[in-house]
């Protein structure tokens, strides 16, 4: 009887230990972003992109859609008329590393891209693969805060890790028509694991 009570007390203590050591659930690191900037090289012009990012530990996976438009401005009766010299669409899948330090992060990625360039001067389309590379930084809230609407004036709901970030991105594509560019990045999502 004594040994039975002794074993029962140990099983009770160990079962309590398992219940007390439940892990705290945290959010995934998932965010979307828009980038606006300028590129130069084999392609030049205005660059706009939209990307979806997922991070597991320090590994970052990014799917990106980008467009590069080279405009020429002509004048007709004192009215500026834009003409598209070339337009490029790019679909990219990138893998890389991302490191978070409080309310700041930096990343570097590389991958593969499919590009389609329409040259308006000679009315020809080029399709080719490339190797995109990017390096970037982001600044965001380091702690959970209430989400704010109306330009940050009205707080809504409970404190959340979901929020905005701002950053700078240097990017390039090594391909038949290579380029290098710099842009401003705006993101929305969960930028780090909040507790």
Indicate residue ranges for each PLM-predicted region.
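Short glycine/proline- and aromatic-enriched beta-strand/turn motifs that initiate or cap beta-hairpins
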Residues: 16-69, 187-189
